[in-house]
C-alpha cells in the first residue's frame, strides 16, 4: 500500500542497516518517477517542503551566477511560500525583488518582469529568475516567455510546478519550457499530495 509506506513520511535515511536499503529503494523509485514526469535527470528526495526548496533555489542561483546579488521572483507564487522565503533570507546577503501580478489578468506582468530583469542584468546584479507554472490563482503563467528571458540574459531559471497537475492535466514539462524547448535550469515542487495524507498540513515533501 503506497499510502502507508513509511518511506514517504520522511526524507531522512534511517541508520538501522536492516531498514536503510528499503528506504533508499523507495527514494530511488520516487526520484525515477519524478524524473520521467519532468524530464529532469536529477531529482532530489527531498527537502522539507516546497517553500524551503524554493528558498534553497535562491542560493543555487547565486552560486551558479556568483557576480549576481539579486533574484527576481514572481509575486504570483503562493503567499505561504513568499513568507518562508522572506523569513529565510532575512539577515543574509540574498536579495529578492518581487514582480507583481497584473490586477486585471492575475498573471505576472511580463513587461515589468523583463524591464526589471534587463535593468538588473545591465548592472550585473541579476542572479536568476523564479516563476510558477500554475500561480496561486490557478492561472497558467507564460512560462515559455519567462524561460526565453532567462536564456537571453544568461541567468538560471527556476520553475515552480505541481507534479499532480503535470501528471494529469496535460501541462508541458519544465524540461521543455521555452520557445525552443530548452527548458528551465531548476525545478521546485511539492510532492505531499502524491502519496501523503493531509495530516493538518504536513509533513511536506519538497
Question: What role is predicted for each listed range?
Answer:
Residues 1-53:
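Conserved N-terminal alpha-helix of the aminotransferase class I/II PLP-enzyme fold
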Residues 52-206:
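Conserved PLP-enzyme active-site core in the AAT-like
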